[in-house]
Amino acid sequence: MKILKYLTILIFSFVSFNQANAFLDKDNKGAQSTGREDLSFLEAKNSNFKKGRDALKQAIKYKNKKKFEKSSKRLDKAIKYFVSAYEETPENLELLNYLGLVYYMVGDTIMSEIYYNQALVIDPKNNLINQKLGELYFNTKRTSLAKEKLKILSNCNCEEYSVLKMIIDGK
């Protein structure tokens, strides 16, 4: 009877261990994992993403203080860091949003539009990115495209809709 008990425990342990390993790939990340779900590395002290975000914050502070040359230098640094981070994680929605914003701030609306559209490929219903792209379209005299973005936001009952509507209506 004891042998049967130990044999049952041994078989149960073996089956449980194999089922647990079935969910792990060769790197022990998880079979369904793409490795991108955990984006905590973006917040690491020396990550390009964090450096870019810090440079952008500094650029905005300098711009508000009317120190435009310093602001411009910080924006260039932010672009450099964000592009480096983009090479590491090209499908990060927050990063694509920052790239669109920074390029818009330096006046490169073509690159800004590219990154905003790339973000919308990942999340077509993202309210903030639809709003920002709508603003870009409006400011580049493409009102019909701006109104399309407004239409996408019309069902969200959100601040982004209100902001874009005020911009388009000129209020």
What are these regions, as identified by a protein language model?
Residues 45, 93-94, 127-128, 160-162:
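Helix-start (N-cap) detector for alpha-helical repeat units in TPR-like alpha-solenoids
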Residues 121, 131-160:
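TPR/TPR-like (Sel1-like) alpha-helical repeat modules
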